[in-house]
Amino acid sequence: MTIRHQGQQYRPRMAFLQKIEALVKDMQNPETGVRMHNQRVLVTSVPHAMTGGDVLQWITQRLWISNLEAQNLGNFIVKYGYIYPLQDPKNLILKPDSSLYRFQTPYFWPTQQWPAEDTDYAIYLAKRNIKKKGILEEYEKENYDFLNKKINYKWDFVIMQAKEQYRTGKERNKADRYALDCQEKAYWLVHRSPPGMNNVLDYGLDRVTNPNEVKKQTVTAVRKEIMYYQQALMRSTVKSSVSLGGIVKYSEQFSSNDAIMSGCLPSNPWITDDTQFWDLNAKLVEIPTKMRVERWAFNFSELIRDPKGRQSFQYFLKKEFSGENLGFWEACEDLKYGDQSKVKEKAEEIYKLFLAPGARRWINIDGKTMDITVKGLRHPHRYVLDAAQTHIYMLMKKDSYARYLKSPIYKEMLAKAIEPQETTKRSSTLPFMRRHLRSSPSPVILRQLEEEEKAREAANTVDITQPGQHLAPSPHLAVYTGTCVPPSPSSPFSPSCRSPRKPFASPSRFIRRPSIAICPSPSRVALEGSSGLEPKGEASWSGANSGPSVTENREPSADHSRPQPRAPPKARAALSLGRFLRRGCLASPVFARLSPKCPSVSHGKVQPLGDMGQQLPRLKPKKVANFFQIKMEMPTDSGTCLMDSDDPRAGESGDQTTEKEVICPWESLAEGKAG
């Protein structure tokens, strides 16, 4: 079916519907349009259905607009009947969820030439009355009774058509019948909206003539066209650069007086509920504001437009014995914008007071202007004194206005003017308070910036083996601490090395990670040890930091009391991953705590802070092997994290309870050899 839009010739305000139709056509494109598929509604499978979320997403991606703008445009499309809802027909809005919608057939589009007549609506209501067995909405019952009285002469035809359409509809299958019912209901909801719903098609009366129709050229029309072009040739032409310069100058001059661009002093009364702005800028206030007085110096029209400015200018003219000029101009304005019934009376008074020979306030105008004015007063009208008013206006503008700006009257007024200070209402949550407005960035630019940022993040590969990466402390992270008893020779994988079955504690109870100066990262310790400048039996970082050394905090034991031969310096990173796996900690879930205030415990739980939660029982000191710790002993009183390495040959002795040193799992064999 072709789309007929001849009805738009008489409805210029509905011309935007053609743009909506073009967008709806793009939506129905099988390749680039909205995804449509069969959906089951109640007991019927409706074909070519779509969800509101898919429509909103398509509009956002197709037009490159924000979600709010796409939602507004989608609501317009639904309200004008191009898309109708299946599940909630009365609610003509686009829901951004899984609600089902269908495209309206072009026959029911608003741009069709045929109008929504009362006969068609009566047939629709009669058919619904037969189908629902008299159960209609209240407004539908009222319209049914009203149409029965209005077109009673052809009501038999209405009932006959309704019965025939109802019988034809029963012969269709369920899906087609359900879709056609939804289409008709959506059409009449748009064209016969129920009470309380906004009628979007209410545009007023149609034009009598077609504005797009080509008119026949007549002699009178051609003469008017010739006269128009002759007058256009007589006008003075100005270069575009001069005109643009004048516009820029005017904008710069009046920018400080623009309440929208620069705000208003002392405050905006519509925002702060403070009427001081209106009080200071009253028409005839005793002392005006400084900004108001400065505006009088912009041009003569600004002065004569302001009642307070006219009052001051009148006082100046009286001192120069020319006050009748401004009085005549005000009388002409009263005649021009006053009551029509008093035009003749006011014109006679003005003539006797200002223009008649020997008048009390006679004005000085040239003889030609006087003759034109006197002839026009024979048949007075609103604009009969325009020639004399223009003459007096130009006289005051070119002569009196310049002297007024240099007079002591204006200077004294400017000196006494009030300059109010900006006041804001603290309880107001509105952000508009004398601030320069900036236009929002385009959604297209924002989306391009987001895509570029994502591309840069994807291109940056993370190498955790490089020094300096991931070594900064993260105060918001909490690392799980577990324990692992050293395995026995008979059982290399101890049961205590299995992962705990209980879930982690609440993140709010985790202890924050300390500063790197107190307990450095094991990666940094390994990297510092790889330099080969420090023996393995010494703590290289204990002397540089303010914290106590490892040897001071470690309790004496039988193993450490025996003197052991010192091994040559060896890098910490020299231990390979295979050695770590052979020592039996493959299944260990233990992670380093890296906190000097929360030691590891043997039960594999996270130690709470302070009095939070249930206090765990204190266990006896026990030697454990931690993931990142080389040698560790459970302290009883001190909470200092033990991060040190002893002689590697200590693990080769006969004592099975001696700790075994491990390395970070990400350190490769090549790095160990290089150290």
Curated annotation (Swiss-Prot):
Biased composition (Polar residues): 542-551
A GO biological process held by the record: dark adaptation
Region (Disordered): 524-571, 637-662
Gene Ontology MF: a single term: GTPase activator activity
CDD domains named in the record: DEP_RGS7-like (cd04450), GGL (cd00068), RGS_RGS9 (cd08739)
Keyword set includes Membrane: yes
Gene3D superfamilies the record matches: 1.10.1240.60, Regulator of G-protein Signalling 4, domain 2 (1.10.167.10), Transducin (heterotrimeric G protein), gamma chain (4.10.260.10), Winged helix-like DNA-binding domain superfamily/Winged helix DNA-binding domain (1.10.10.10)
Modifications after synthesis and translation: Retinal isoform 1 is light-dependent phosphorylated at 'Ser-475'. Phosphorylation is decreased by light exposition. Interaction with RGS9BP is decreased when isoform 1 is phosphorylated at 'Ser-475'.
Keyword set, alphabetical order: Membrane, Phosphoprotein, Sensory transduction, Signal transduction inhibitor, Vision
Tissue specificity: Isoform 1 is expressed in photoreceptor outer segments. Isoform 2 is expressed in brain striatum.
The RGS domain, residue ranges: 299-414
UniProt xrefs under InterPro entries: DEP_dom, G-protein_gamma-like_dom, GGL_sf, RGS, RGS6/7/9/11, RGS6/7/9/11_DHEX_sf, RGS9_RGS, RGS_DHEX
Ranges for domain G protein gamma: 222-283
Cellular component GO terms, alphabetical: glutamatergic synapse; photoreceptor inner segment; postsynaptic density membrane; presynaptic membrane; rod photoreceptor outer segment
Domain DEP: 30-105
Biased composition (Basic and acidic residues): 552-562, 646-662
Record function comment: Inhibits signal transduction by increasing the GTPase activity of G protein alpha subunits thereby driving them into their inactive GDP-bound form. Binds to GNAT1. Involved in phototransduction; key element in the recovery phase of visual transduction.
Known partners and oligomeric status: Heterodimer with GNB5. Interacts with RGS7BP, leading to regulate the subcellular location of the heterodimer formed with GNB5. Component of the RGS9-1-Gbeta5 complex composed of RGS9 (RGS9-1), Gbeta5 (GNB5) and RGS9BP. Interacts with PDE6G and GNAT1.
UniProt protein name: Regulator of G-protein signaling 9
This protein's encoding gene: Rgs9
